[in-house]
């Protein structure tokens, strides 16, 4: 079994960039929770079937994919709906992460999990690497990358673990406040 290093950090911290650099330099496998979260709601999956049964057919786009904007409306206006969705998806995502880790053939595996601390998933890794940035850096990067406004980013930040909570869970820290040279 591979030695698992979890990479976590808040939105806009540069987790994916750091993971991609490690992969390029050391040819190691990456298990990415965000990618898995999208895959478990692809058309025909148990996740999407359950979501459609719960929210109704209007939660789907014409092509059968999840209408993410509609789902966001449903869960952010009603906390119990967000909890229902988390209760459905988190076990599916966790199970797939564990499956991919078990199949990893590289000496090290990077487990990229934005909400590692919030979901208490540190047990999945041998070490936790926090990609740390100042809040203003997170806001600027996310506004530029996702074309959202400052208030939307601040709302996301408020729903995530604090910088202090993440740093307390860290075995190692990368300060990523500077522009990465390629």
Curated annotation (Swiss-Prot):
GO MF assignments: ATP binding; dephospho-CoA kinase activity
Pathway: Cofactor biosynthesis; coenzyme A biosynthesis; CoA from (R)-pantothenate: step 5/5
GO cellular component, one term: cytoplasm
Source taxon at top rank: Bacteria
Pfam families: CoaE
Main location: cytoplasm
SUPFAM superfamilies with a match to the protein in the record: P-loop containing nucleoside triphosphate hydrolases
NCBIfam families named in the record: dephospho-CoA kinase (TIGR00152)
UniProt name for this protein: Dephospho-CoA kinase
Organism in which the protein naturally occurs: Aliivibrio fischeri (strain ATCC 700601 / ES114) (Vibrio fischeri)
